[in-house]
Amino acid sequence: MPLYEHVFLARQDASTQQVEELTTQITSVIEGLGGKVVKMESWGVRSLTYRMHKNRKAHFVLLNIDGPSAVVAEVERQERINEDVIRYLTVRVDELEEGPSAMMRKADRDRDRDDRGGFRGDREGGFRGDREGGFRGGDREGGGFRGDRGPRRPRDDAAPAPAAATEE
């Protein structure tokens, strides 16, 4: 049978319990039509890139589905009707990914990063130029902003300035 990755976004107003019930409902539809859910991941509430239906955040859920195309058509029909579902996307894949998805691996990596601690002390080199506290360099001698350039040299092709027209 074909393999599918299906992701849907539920409104942020919906509780975690409501999202779990929605996922259970979708799973029962899949199994009722002869398919099966190989993997289910809830990515939690995440920020959206842009507003969708007046929502800035949404519950993200991934389902790996093994079933006929009729299963996908019915799941998408059910999600179109349901007001809690903001968006959904189903992609046919050649093989399903083993282990945690990229989003779950990213969450683990972020959690590991937090364990290192936040502040790592003053950085070598001090001030970075675009931050408060002065400027320590640049690509010009003596460093600094444009004010350090010095006077301009006269142009080679400089012609005498035209005389102002006088009225007689």
Curated annotation (Swiss-Prot):
Binds together with bS18 to 16S ribosomal RNA. It comes from Rhodopseudomonas palustris (strain BisB18). Residues 97-168 are annotated as: Disordered. PANTHER family: MITOCHONDRIAL 28S RIBOSOMAL PROTEIN S6, SMALL RIBOSOMAL SUBUNIT PROTEIN BS6M. Belongs to the bacterial ribosomal protein bS6 family. GO terms for biological process: translation. Keywords: Ribonucleoprotein, Ribosomal protein, RNA-binding, rRNA-binding. InterPro entries: Ribosomal_bS6, Ribosomal_bS6_sf, Ribosomal_S6_plastid/chlpt, Transl_elong_EF1B/ribsomal_bS6. GO terms for cellular component: cytosolic small ribosomal subunit. It comes from the Bacteria. Gene3D superfamilies: 3.30.70.60. The gene is rpsF. This is Small ribosomal subunit protein bS6. Residues 105-158 have a biased composition (Basic and acidic residues). One of its GO terms (molecular function) is small ribosomal subunit rRNA binding. It holds the Pfam family Ribosomal_S6. The keyword Ribosomal protein applies. Coiled coil: none annotated.
